[in-house]
From Swiss-Prot:
Sequence ranges of Basic and acidic residues compositional bias: 7-21
GO cellular component, one term: plasma membrane
Species this chain originates from: Mycobacterium tuberculosis (strain ATCC 25618 / H37Rv)
Name used for this protein in its record: Uncharacterized protein Rv0966c
Induction remark: Highly up-regulated during the early stages of invasion of the human blood-brain barrier.
Disulfide bonds: none
Length: 200
């Protein structure tokens, strides 16, 4: 989008108007793309990301993307984004991995049976401010990696196995909440906060 088009988009709305969750998610995705392209250093990206989720007006969000290429945000019709569909990740006598940049659906189920899996949310794009993960391991193992800023709620059960119930560190206010439920039977569900790796 050209600079003049960006100005027109900004002029079509009130800068002091309240931003929606959809607007905050859009800017978070733009920041993730900028970091992936090397336009933002890791510390700058994480700082802007936290500020994006805490922003309440269009003006605050526009400041975060003012020096980056990409579309300016505009008012939404209906106020809802199109979230990714519910997803099921299976590892039956095998494994699954979901890493890198991908859209996190609002609901996600992971299941390992005599297998293993890795679910890495650190570089993913959240499509909702609340994410529900159902994690099940039966004689298998899986690891869920969380970025430092997300809020986490865990309600898991274990029988002759492991299911992490706490993660080190606190999330940032306003950032998406990840709720993890499930159980392990002779298996393991590991849940960890892990810093993003600086771009080389």
């Amino acid at each position: 989008m050209s600079n003049s088009a960006q100005r027109d988009a900004r002029n079509s709305r009130d800068e002091s108007a309240r931003a929606s969750d959809t607007d905050r998610i859009q800017i978070a995705q733009l920041l993730a793309y900028a970091a992936e392209q090397g336009r933002l250093q890791l510390t700058d990206y994480e700082d802007r990301l936290a500020r994006a989720y805490a922003a309440t007006t269009y003006q605050e969000l526009d400041r975060l993307r003012a020096d980056l290429p990409g579309a300016a945000i505009g008012p939404r019709r209906g106020g809802e984004c199109n979230p990714a569909p519910s997803t099921l990740l299976l590892a039956l006598l095998g494994g699954f991995e979901r890493r890198g940049r991908w859209n996190v659906p609002k609901k996600l189920t992971t299941f390992t049976l005599w297998g293993s899996g890795v679910l890495d949310l650190r570089y993913a794009d959240f499509t909702s401010t609340e994410v529900d993960i159902r994690a099940y391991s039966i004689m298998g193992a899986q690891t869920i990696l969380l970025p430092p800023e997300v809020n986490v709620e865990i309600h898991g059960h274990r029988v002759m196995g492991g299911f992490d119930r706490k993660v080190v560190g606190e999330g940032t206010r306003g950032v998406p909440t990840v709720r993890i439920r499930g159980f392990s039977l002779w298996g393991d569900v590991g849940i960890k906060r892990k810093p993003r790796k600086p771009r080389k």
